[in-house]
């Protein structure tokens, strides 16, 4: 049987990444071990924006090696699982022209529209995660994908 296409369409990907709240970001320690942390994020212009504490393990790892992988998923039962795996580089977003939009969307998503407590955030840094490769899956599509594969096989006589 041919491989089933369970990937998210571009519209589904945009919707999924806009709705999800947490990315699990994996960076590499100096010895090469994975360091995985959950972070809140916003998806703006095909880029993941998040913030973290300056000088923590995550930001130190990224200063040494900006390569990272992020996992965003949803669902509990196997047939409900869906998600996105992003591979790319993470960098500080200090001069990014989209930062005001990012802050506004972040505030709406996580603070109910209130501005973040910047007076307590003096040691926070905004990060930009630029995807190099995105993989997605939606196991809710399995029944239809199997039915399509069967129809295709029947049509080709395979």
Short names for language-model regions:
Residues 20-54, 62, 70-73:
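Short beta-strand segments
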Residues 13, 58, 64, 98-102, ...:
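Amphipathic alpha-helical interface surfaces
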Residues 44-45, 57-60, 79, 145-146:
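A short local loop/turn or secondary-structure capping micro-motif enriched for an aromatic residue
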């Amino acid at each position: 049987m041919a491989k089933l296409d369970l990937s998210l369409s571009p519209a589904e990907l945009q919707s999924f990444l806009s709705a999800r709240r947490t990315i699990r970001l994996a960076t590499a320690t100096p010895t090469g071990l994975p360091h995985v942390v959950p972070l809140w994020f916003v998806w703006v212009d095909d880029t993941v924006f998040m913030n973290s504490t300056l000088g923590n393990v995550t930001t130190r790892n990224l200063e040494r090696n900006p390569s990272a992988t992020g996992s965003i998923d949803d669902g509990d039962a196997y047939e409900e699982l869906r998600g996105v795996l992003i591979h790319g580089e993470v960098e500080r977003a200090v001069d990014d022209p989209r930062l005001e939009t990012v802050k506004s969307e972040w505030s709406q998503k996580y603070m109910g529209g209130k501005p973040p407590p910047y007076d307590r955030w003096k040691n926070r840094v905004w990060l930009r995660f630029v995807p190099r490769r995105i993989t997605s899956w939606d196991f809710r599509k399995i029944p239809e994908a199997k039915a399509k594969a069967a129809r295709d096989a029947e049509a080709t006589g395979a």
